[in-house]
From Swiss-Prot:
Family the entry assigns: Belongs to the universal ribosomal protein uS7 family.
NCBIfam families: rpsG_bact
Keywords: Ribonucleoprotein, Ribosomal protein, RNA-binding, rRNA-binding, tRNA-binding
Name of the protein described by the UniProt record: Small ribosomal subunit protein uS7
PROSITE patterns, A to Z: RIBOSOMAL_S7
């Protein structure tokens, strides 16, 4: 934690094709070794695959998938009197988005398809249909929070 006041959040610019900040965050998360062009190509190709397979607008499918992945609750370890409790807390909107993108990419990278664009498209389509590994991760997180509801009074 900084001693000299609050650190300003850096604002990301919307991507050129879809004019969306969430897509920019997705591209930034896909990016490895600063290769933004490669990451953009993967993302946009995945969106084209989604449009082909589903017959719907790719952004619509993406937004549905993100809403199905983003968690509402999570647990945070809190140490009280020598015991560590998993305390359920609500997730801030920005963290919800970050976790959703992170879980989606982890799930996509574990898939069996040949290229990353196919994996990402597959995971987004699955997530928009409320299936897939990323949605399962969200459900597991919610179950964990529900199971530890008794410790909610230890909230920060």
């Amino acid at each position: 934690m900084p001693r000299k006041g609050h650190i300003a959040k850096r604002d990301v610019l919307p991507d050129p094709l879809y004019n969306s900040k969430v897509v920019t965050k997705l591209i930034n998360s896909i990016m490895l070794d600063g290769k933004r062009g490669v990451a953009q190509k993967i993302c946009y190709d995945a969106f084209e695959i989604i449009a082909e397979k589903s017959g719907k607008d790719a952004m619509e499918v993406f937004e549905t998938a993100m809403n199905n992945i983003m968690p509402l609750l999570e647990v945070k370890a809190r140490r009280i009197g020598g015991a560590t409790y998993q305390v359920p807390i609500e997730v801030r909107p920005e963290r919800r988005q970050t976790l959703g993108i992170r879980w989606m990419l982890i799930a996509a990278r574990k898939r069996g398809e040949r290229s990353m664009r196919e994996r990402l498209a597959g995971e987004l389509l699955d997530a928009s249909n409320n299936t897939g590994a990323a949605v399962k991760k969200r459900e597991d997180t919610h179950k964990m929070a529900e199971a530890n509801k008794a410790f909610a009074h230890y909230r920060y």
